[in-house]
Swiss-Prot record:
Superkingdom, taxonomy of origin: Bacteria
SUPFAM superfamilies referenced in this protein's UniProt entry, alphabetically: Trypsin-like serine proteases
A Pfam family assignment: Mycop_pep_DUF31
Residue ranges of the TM segments: 7-27
Record GO cellular component, one term: membrane
Annotated InterPro entries: Mycoplasma_peptidase_DUF31, Peptidase_S1_PA
Membrane topology: Single-pass membrane protein
Broad class of the protein's primary localization: membrane
NCBIfam families: MAG2960_Ser_prot
Naturally occurring in which organism (per UniProt): Ureaplasma parvum serovar 3 (strain ATCC 700970)
Localization (cell): Membrane
Name of this chain's protein: Uncharacterized protein UU030
Amino acid sequence: MNLKTKFFLKVISVIAPIVIIPTILANCAHINSNELDNAKTNLKGSVEVVNINPYKTKQMLASNINKEQINSYFIFIFNLIKTNQKIEEKILDKNDYEILNWAANDNDGTLGINIYIKTTKQSYLINTKPVFLTDKQNNYLQELKYKTPAVYSIDEILKFSNNPYNLIHNNPYYREQLLRAKIYFNQNEANVDDSKLYMNKIGYSEFGSDVQKRLENAFKIRYDEQNIYQINSPQILAKETKTLTSYIDKKTNNNYSINIELIKKLIQINPFGKLPKNFAQLINLIKKEEYPKFLTITKNESVDNIVVKDIYYRIIDRYAKLEFILEIYNKKTKQTVYLSANFNQKNSGLLKNEDYFQYIFDRTISLDLLTTKDGKNVELNSGTGWIVDRIIDDSLPKNKIKLLIATNNHVMGWSNLAISKDNRMKSRWFNKQEYINYLENNAGFISSNIYEDKDRYQYLLWGTAPLKSPVSNKYNSLSGISFSNLAKVYNITNQNFINRAWYIPQLSANGIKINENLRTWYQINQEDIKSIKNGTLDFVLVPMVFDIEDIKEKLPNYYKVLNTKDEANWYIGLGNSKKYLPQLQLFSGGYPGDVNPNSSAIVSWRGSKSYGSLIQAFDREIKNESILDYYGPKQINNIDGYQKVGEGYLNKLFNVGTRVITSDEIGDLGSGSSGSMIIDSNFNLVGIHFASLNSRAYGAPNDSMIGNLFVAQSQDLSGDIDVRAAVIKKLKAENIYTYKLNPKVSS
């Protein structure tokens, strides 16, 4: 396709996840650089300090900082009061000022800094916000310094085979952290700064003996990347350090090497997953006195001379490479040796990042809708969906199949077809003549198959990338979808799209904070506790009919299992009805908008992998911005819950589903990736992606993904708290049979 083809769409409106971008400097205008230099000494002005690396400062006491760190972690802004009383700002260069002295207040985590501005010849005393550890927080961390989660024997670890819940919740260290958090949040001194310490240890955020307490505590936690559960990073041995595959103790003639079979067994049963980092995560839970069991000795003799001091790694998840290294010390010879063994996909059960991304890629599609505002130009509304199951429908022609597709409510909501503050901006379907005119006017830019397909405008469209990028967290020209590659969803058209969704979760939420202008939406009980009934997840299930030839072309790995004994197992379904654990890594992938101006693609495949998460019971603050507008049949009976528009209703729903906030170790998902599935490192489906958090904007090392979990983790939610169970119940009630969730049982 000609590169110009990408732009014949005129307007590409990509359905985007909510992108939350916290800013460090708001309305910070720069004055001319020579204005401050030419200032008089009696010039009026003030100085403020801004922390640009809170990730670092929140790991230290203010009393431990030095001048170099102050210059590295903070910037200073001079507020110049001009003759017309307007204030202009300049970020000071390091040669504009001199730090005279500073004073720490470890009680509240602040730092007072006295700086001298050279051009004004004045000194200014300024105080930071509480961006450092307080004494109280530091004492808490010091208490934990001598506690360890490494409490298991190897035999105990083997008994927890592929059972992460028992592995984590039977650990006395984790149980103690949970107890500490419960005590802390039941006191009245909980605050957002101290709460971070507890979130980093447990990854779960709902505490309180009653609903009122849980509501209050919900606002004492920041739901961001810095509050996730922190997985301990493996100790990496420097590349230049020499390792040996075997070591002979010349005193005893014993030959020592790594116990290869034990390592392979632990890889195979690892409850955390099959990545090299997952293996290191598991070993972190093993008692140090068990380390000698990782050795193989040629002679069955005492190993009193040899001490296993520590475990190190060289790890690359991208390639499934693991070098397991024991630091051993010979007490007789005073010799230290690093004994190692290498593991990969060929000699063990290890997996690489792309194995997870490939699994997602094979089941994921781009969903695209052509709309227009003026009947002349095209908007392409794009989101991501994935195959849940196949519906058994004998009424279909042999060349068609019906699939249950999952995506976000806001992807399939299509409220832009029903409402707009300005009717001139309201989107709509093309009519036949408008689309024919559009094709004629753009004939020089579009492919022949698009030009000849005169009824394409009537259908929801779908597509996949011809090839998955070898590295899914990077954009690749091979992983794009062009406009001409889109196929039709045959049962969703401009005539029947109002009835597109088969399942929208229904939730009630108790213990909420809500704007008073939404008073007709909520109920109040005798204890003055507010609740709402029109809650949901940002999730819908839509039956879609596909042509098998399109499946063959666009989903070849799926086509291979169609109508075989392996088909039912291929479908991901809706998880396993178990609660997600924040200690498990997450993977997601979808089709955000293509950012390469030299590409003909409209969207491209991209993946994201997280390392540690935070579970938010649900968003208890209900605002106008929280509303999910869904245009379709009436979903709720609340007086303000719907509005008749044309043939359908504009339903107003709130996303009160349990959320997961991640720390994206690699990759990030932008506009168009809304609706991407989220799986854990054991290939279990746990939820759906709907928003992004630009955490790097405030100094965090990684951005975040926000998703809804399919199993609720709050006692204040009711209704479809287990999406899988709710869907199976609905399938059975409506006598709908599928390959995975509700198969026909032969009598």
